[in-house]
């Protein structure tokens, strides 16, 4: 046993260290590498020196029963004394089976947890550490509190593959990792805590003890608001990368609190309902944008502490802004300190690279056929809602989870039990995650980034769906951008590209997304996808944004689009805020602001987004003129007419059939001079006439500016 202790290879330290139940063995054994002496300290009694048993072992052979007695140890470190509680006197370090296997409670018990244990009538505060490493032959806790010496604090093998140890008097902010021996006794790289709530950056990547109970939330009004049906709400998401929205004068990151001070008033002014953060889970490589996470339970410390991130969410909520996080359950990186070969085995991924390795991203794929892995991920999703009060998660790369042959050639994948390409384990996990989120957090939303035609992504699980609240409309994004990039003179040949998305617009609960994916890897900015000279580019962009806000579906724009950013997104720099010195870009920003407020204030533009009753074509086949028109209809019967002219040719005396007799009042014109448009005179109040057009008995006459979208309300 001494040899195992000296090699940090002991799996049952409580059988050898601490107080003995059998007094014939002695009263106490202490293992303290590097100590020159150890003494027993009992309250109100003289100290008793322990004998040196081996090089690092000390034993007390006095006739004392310390099994139920609280005691301390006076450690002599070459003349420097340290008074500590012996962790091996605390046997009550386990938790109930259900607590360790139920996703809603797992994160309250695994990892490092502040707790108080009772011993000899005394309440002893400290931190309990639990880690799942079923194939390890030994696990030690190492950290700044023991000079990263794996011999000092061997952990006890408990049931169900879990190892545990309680360290008395350990404070918040202490760095730690796990030192393990693999199945054959081989040494492994120090591992960060998979359940760690806080982590250090390069080079240590160590986990840090953190107490969730300390932060005092101020968002009770937001958290207790009535449960609403999100499909009927106006949802406008501002997708944001925390490290590159703005920088300080030195070019450094804003921390979470500084970001809150700058961003929250901006979101309120611009009319966004939610901020959608690209992944904030701890990730070692900044250039991954967060999509290679190692610490799923820790908000990245690049921008501050977990308390600072809570402050950010709190500030958003107090201003009426919801917070959605990108969540990455599809894969994880191969960093030595992370989940890869965690206990010396592929604990979190399939050992067969055809199922366990993502060749495009050079990362491991979670083995969702393992119950513990599924529980780990579902627990993580619930954790962010519970501990950080987030309002939604956008699940990254869902298609890569659903299909076993995703981005794989013949022979590079293994079929399921029925010979097909669907990943049954991933499907079951996603369904379970959605059910758990909506069960415990009924006001939450889950959003899928899913790029295929997999059926029922946003259908309830009881109807056979995956159970997501919404799905990104990747088809709309692809088709609409493909259309708008064409020169106006060529758009008539691509008219179906613009109208086709309406064929399936209500097959899912869609979010129309112009995300970060469209402004990276040489794709350029949204602004610079537009054809023509500078004025035409901006006019096209304004018309396109108007078209987007008039279409059925919730809205998402990546940061920078709202100011007409011309450069491709660069994560190493802030947005091109200097562009707001120019009227054209001021106009794009002003238009985005007005579109958000219009979308939120007009029920017809959002409350039937997800059902066919909210949309009617008025003009869909005017390919030669590159004009489309439709009406959006609210539950209460309100109607808003949206007309887009995608050529630089103004249309005077343009007659359009309408189903209702009445007046159509102008709500918004993307070509308005206040948006740096041409200021072409438009009809402000169009009264219907009994003139047949488009097979409708009534019609109105409009003036359509070049490259524009107009919104009219029937009154």
Swiss-Prot record:
Keywords, ordered alphabetically: Carbohydrate metabolism, Glycogen biosynthesis, Glycogen metabolism, Glycosyltransferase, Transferase
Naturally occurring in which organism (per UniProt): Vibrio vulnificus (strain CMCP6)
Cited function: Catalyzes the formation of the alpha-1,6-glucosidic linkages in glycogen by scission of a 1,4-alpha-linked oligosaccharide from growing alpha-1,4-glucan chains and the subsequent attachment of the oligosaccharide to the alpha-1,6 position.
Top-rank EC class of the record's enzyme: transferase
Disulfide bond residue pairs: none
InterPro entries: A-amylase/branching_C, Branching_enzy, GlgB, GlgB_N, GlgB_N_E_set_prok, Glyco_hydro_13_cat_dom, Glyco_hydro_13_N, Glyco_hydro_b
Gene3D superfamilies associated with the record: Glycosidases, Golgi alpha-mannosidase II, Immunoglobulins
Listed EC numbers: 2.4.1.18
Catalytic activity: Transfers a segment of a (1->4)-alpha-D-glucan chain to a primary hydroxy group in a similar glucan chain
Record-level Gene Ontology MF annotations: 1,4-alpha-glucan branching enzyme activity; cation binding; hydrolase activity, hydrolyzing O-glycosyl compounds
UniProt cross-references to NCBIfam families, sorted A to Z: branching_enzym, PRK05402.1, PRK12313.1
A Gene Ontology BP annotation from the UniProt entry: glycogen biosynthetic process
Domain of life: Bacteria
UniProt pathway: Glycan biosynthesis; glycogen biosynthesis
Subunit structure: Monomer.
Name of the protein this chain belongs to: 1,4-alpha-glucan branching enzyme GlgB
Family: Belongs to the glycosyl hydrolase 13 family. GlgB subfamily.
One GO term describing the cellular component: cytosol
KW Transferase (keyword) present: yes
Pfam families registered for this protein in UniProt: Alpha-amylase, Alpha-amylase_C, CBM_48, GlgB_N
Gene: glgB
Entries under HAMAP family matching the protein: GlgB
């Amino acid at each position: 046993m001494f040899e195992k202790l000296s090699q940090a290879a002991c799996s049952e330290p409580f059988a050898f260290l601490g107080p003995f139940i059998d007094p014939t063995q002695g009263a106490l054994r202490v293992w303290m590498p590097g100590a020159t002496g150890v003494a027993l300290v009992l309250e109100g009694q003289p100290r008793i020196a322990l004998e040196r048993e081996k090089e690092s072992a000390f034993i007390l052979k006095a006739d004392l029963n310390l099994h139920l007695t609280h005691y301390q140890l006076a450690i002599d470190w070459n003349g420097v004394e340290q008074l500590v509680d012996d962790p091996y006197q605390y046997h009550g370090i386990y938790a109930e089976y259900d607590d360790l296997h139920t996703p809603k409670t797992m994160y309250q018990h695994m990892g490092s947890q502040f707790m108080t244990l009772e011993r000899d009538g005394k309440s002893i505060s400290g931190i309990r550490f639990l880690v799942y490493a079923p194939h390890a032959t030994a696990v030690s806790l190492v950290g700044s509190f023991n000079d990263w010496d794996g011999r000092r604090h061997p952990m006890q093998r408990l049931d169900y593959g879990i190892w545990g140890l309680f360290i008395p008097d350990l404070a918040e902010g202490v760095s730690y990792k796990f030192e393990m021996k693999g199945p054959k006794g081989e040494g492994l790289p120090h591992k960060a805590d998979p359940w760690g709530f806080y982590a250090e950056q390069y080079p240590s990547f160590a986990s840090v003890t953190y107490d969730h109970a300390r932060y005092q939330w101020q968002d009770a009004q937001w958290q207790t608001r009535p449960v609403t049906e999100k499909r009927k709400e106006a949802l406008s998401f501002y997708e944001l990368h925390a490290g590159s929205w703005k920088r300080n004068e030195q070019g450094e990151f804003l921390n979470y609190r500084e970001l809150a001070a700058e961003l929250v008033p901006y979101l309120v002014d611009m009319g966004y309902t939610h901020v959608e953060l690209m992944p904030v889970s701890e990730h070692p490589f900044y250039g991954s944008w967060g999509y290679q996470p190692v610490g799923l339970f820790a908000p990245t410390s690049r921008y501050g502490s977990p308390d600072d991130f809570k402050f950010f969410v709190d500030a958003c909520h107090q201003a009426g802004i919801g917070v959605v996080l990108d969540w990455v359950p599809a894969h994880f990186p191969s960093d030595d300190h992370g989940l890869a070969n965690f206990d010396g085995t592929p604990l979190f991924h399939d050992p067969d690279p055809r199922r366990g390795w993502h060749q495009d991203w050079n990362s491991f794929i979670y083995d969702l056929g393992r119950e513990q892995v599924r529980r780990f991920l579902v627990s993580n999703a619930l954790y962010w809602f519970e501990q950080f009060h987030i309002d939604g998660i956008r699940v990254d790369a869902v298609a890569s989870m659903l299909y076993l042959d995703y981005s794989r050639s013949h022979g590079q994948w293994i079929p399921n039990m029925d010979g097909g390409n669907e990943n049954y384990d991933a499907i079951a996990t996603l369904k379970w995650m959605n059910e758990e989120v909506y069960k415990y957090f009924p006001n939450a939303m889950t959003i899928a980034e899913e790029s295929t035609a997999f059926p029922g992504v946003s259908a309830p699980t009881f109807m056979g769906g995956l159970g997501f609240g919404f799905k990104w409309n990747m088809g709309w994004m692809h088709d609409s951008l493909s259309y708008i990039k064409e020169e106006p003179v060529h758009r008539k040949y691509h008219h179906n590209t613009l109208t086709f998305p309406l064929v399936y617009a209500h097959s899912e609960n869609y979010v129309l997304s112009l995300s970060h994916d469209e402004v990276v890897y040489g794709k350029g900015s949204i602004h610079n996808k537009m054809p023509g000279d500078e004025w035409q580019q901006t006019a096209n962009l304004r018309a396109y944004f108007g078209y987007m806000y008039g279409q059925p579906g919730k809205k998402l724009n990546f940061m920078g689009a709202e100011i007409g950013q011309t450069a491709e997104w660069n994560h190493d720099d802030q947005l091109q805020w200097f562009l707001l010195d120019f009227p054209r870009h001021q106009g794009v920003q002003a238009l985005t602001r007005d579109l958000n407020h219009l979308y939120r204030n007009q029920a017809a533009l959002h409350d039937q987004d997800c059902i066919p009753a909210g949309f009617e074509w008025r003009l869909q086949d005017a390919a030669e003129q590159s004009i489309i028109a439709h009406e959006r209809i609210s539950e209460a019967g309100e109607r808003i007419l949206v007309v887009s002219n995608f050529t630089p040719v103004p249309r005077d005396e343009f007659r359009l059939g309408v189903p209702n007799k009445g007046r159509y009042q102008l709500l918004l014109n993307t070509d308005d001079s206040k948006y740096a448009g041409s200021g072409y005179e438009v009809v402000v109040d169009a009264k219907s006439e009994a003139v047949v057009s488009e097979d409708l008995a009534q019609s109105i006459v409009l003036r359509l500016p070049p490259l524009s979208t107009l919104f009219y309300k029937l009154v």
